[in-house]
């Protein structure tokens, strides 16, 4: 595995391998067992979209793995002033050992990998959020022990989170249901992918239909970065797509609730449900650290070292 560009590129075995490695790294961290698997290496972190969790978890993770993380904003790169991405990729490949990029267009991530000669990790694009979903899958498996027989349900906008959850959930063997309003479906390429999974995938407009019998309920903000001008209109469109006590009652007893954060209480999730499931949600947030460390090791370390 040379890069993590999108979960569509990974096999089931590769996903499970990353989750197993993340579990191992989490155990070692909790027991003060050092694992400097990237000693002396430098990860360049390109942020064209800001983020608390992505920066802190990658920077901390790289430190714990014995390496160094270098923060690069749009202001630090000539790419923001018109330099072709292929030139940026080739220059950074001479200085760094890996690149993590959080940006708008998936094409930028793909081109960094195409023209560069070092591993590239997708920290988020408008199309997908693979690192977050690997953390989600890790958290789900911690609670339930395996993915067998589970139903995962996403409620809200058919955005990058929905796209990656669909792909990741189906690839590890879960049933996946998604509820979105008309006009806000997941990406067409992802819906095409689901055709190979038959009735293991369901796309609904009724959130209660999607949530029925679910073991995991997941949501995300109604308004993603770059959509701020649509905020008030989206509040009206998504008002019925909220994880609340009524929707939770449609799921299986003891259902897990996840949210990638930041959460807007009273919109996509109620304050009451958020606080009742806060331990699950913040375990999910912690697991970003461990899952991303596993990704960095998988693409940057020598296989013999782990």
Q: How would you describe each model-predicted region?
A:
Residues 65, 95, 115-116, 172, ...:
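Short, structured coil segments at secondary-structure junctions
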Residues 195-271:
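Rossmann-like adenosine-cofactor binding region
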Residues 42-43, 47-95:
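Active-site cofactor/substrate anionic-group-binding motifs, chiefly glycine-
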Residues 48-60, 142-219:
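Glycine-rich phosphate/diphosphate-binding loop of Rossmann-like nucleotide-binding domains
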Residues 254-255, 261-306:
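Adenosine-phosphate binding glycine-rich loop
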Residues 1-56, 60:
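Positively charged, low-complexity intrinsically disordered leader regions
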Residues 35, 97-168, 259:
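Anion-binding alpha/beta catalytic cores of soluble intermediary-metabolism enzymes, centered on
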